[in-house]
A protein has these predicted regions:
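Non-catalytic substrate/cofactor recognition surfaces at enzyme active-site rims
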Residues: 1-153
């Protein structure tokens, strides 16, 4: 379906991936969200990253690492307030996406760890007790960058 479709719910899924080094420092984030960066339109006569500029700035400022935005399937998905020349509106949309992403990052488990259910404790109502444990080494991945000199032919 192309264009606005009032008979179907919009996909508002925000997928966030975190890339860390071996001591848990964030090296980068990957963010997938279905929304065209179309806040700014014909009233804006400058080249602009739209809301993604503010998003990337805030992510770098708060994590110390770059972020990669991957636009999800968004044939009909765009900001409700859009087609404007108002740069402040695009910046607002960028802050909304960045702060939502940062909230997801804050809620993620510590790199290399996972939560598991330990027990229930009775305290007027059954309370779940969760503990942290290391992730098995087989599920950890690592990478190394190497440089190869090649002659141009």
């Amino acid at each position: 379906y192309v264009g606005y479709n009032s008979s179907k719910p919009a996909d508002d899924t925000l997928l966030v991936g975190r890339i860390t080094n071996s001591i848990g420092e964030i090296l980068g984030t990957v963010v997938n969200y279905a929304c065209h960066p179309t806040t700014l339109a014909w009233e804006n006569l400058k080249i602009s990253p739209d809301f993604l500029g503010t998003f990337k700035e805030l992510m770098k400022e708060n994590t110390g690492a770059p972020s990669l935005f991957i636009q999800g399937a968004s044939g009909d998905l765009a900001p409700a307030a859009q087609y404007s020349g108002n740069v402040a509106l695009a910046e607002k949309h960028g802050r909304q996406l960045a702060f939502s992403t940062l909230a997801v990052l804050e809620g993620m488990s510590t790199p290399g760890k996972s939560l598991f259910f330990k027990e229930t404790v009775a305290s007027g109502a059954p309370l779940a007790i969760w503990k942290s444990k290391p992730v098995p080494a087989a599920s950890n991945m690592s990478a190394e960058m190497i440089t190869i000199e090649m002659e141009i032919q």
